[in-house]
């Protein structure tokens, strides 16, 4: 208000849309698109249990590394407490929720070389499937490789195929299945869901009652 702002912060609105000749629609964006090669880095969103500030550290170093390689860096994150949302970290900052509908519109506007999801924790990793489905390049580890690592069942099958030893385990989708599975395994048991990081939803149980 008191002086001209030079900070490349962008906040979206759903009031104006652009329609391509093929009928595809996305939100209008005032950000000036350059002809530089560029990458988008997805942040981790707000801090919460199971996902801490270490992913912000990863995002910042990812942005700096991309800059050193000559890329224009575009950060998408919505946490004002992080370093990745500082005005002098990335070339552009979209202060947006790390949700698909926001990210897709930005990708359609900026047309990056690809998207980096591996640095933003579980929040960013969950976007990988959508990116792969829509044919948007994921820089680095592919969605299938990410899913292979996060799906406990697929990962254990891989370990079996590679003859790598691992603790006894089982997969249950209902309480009854978990109870029956516990009869075949010895307590204490480490119970945890797939597709989480940082121990979210993890519990050690020592008997059926705790299970």
Describe each region flagged by the PLM.
Residues 1-211:
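N-terminal beta-alpha lobe that positions the nucleotide/phosphoryl donor
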């Amino acid at each position: 208000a008191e002086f001209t702002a030079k900070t490349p912060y962008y906040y979206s609105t759903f009031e104006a849309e652009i329609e391509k000749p093929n009928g595809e629609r996305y939100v209008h964006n005032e950000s000036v698109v350059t002809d530089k090669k560029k990458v988008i880095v997805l942040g981790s969103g707000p801090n919460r249990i199971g996902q801490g500030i270490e992913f912000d550290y990863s995002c910042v170093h990812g942005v700096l590394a991309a800059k050193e390689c000559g890329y224009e860096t575009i950060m998408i994150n919505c946490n004002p407490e992080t370093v990745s949302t500082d005005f002098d970290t990335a070339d552009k900052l979209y202060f947006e929720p790390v949700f698909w509908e926001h990210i897709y519109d930005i990708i359609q506007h900026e047309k990056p070389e690809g998207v980096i999801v591996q640095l933003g924790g579980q929040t960013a990793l969950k976007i990988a499937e959508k990116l792969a489905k829509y044919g948007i390049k994921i820089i680095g580890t592919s969605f299938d490789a990410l899913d292979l690592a996060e799906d406990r069942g697929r990962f254990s099958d891989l370990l079996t195929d590679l003859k790598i030893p691992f603790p006894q385990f089982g997969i249950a989708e209902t309480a009854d299945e978990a109870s029956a599975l516990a009869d075949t395994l010895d307590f204490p048991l480490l119970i945890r869901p797939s597709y989480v990081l940082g121990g979210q939803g993890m519990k050690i149980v020592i008997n059926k009652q705790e299970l």
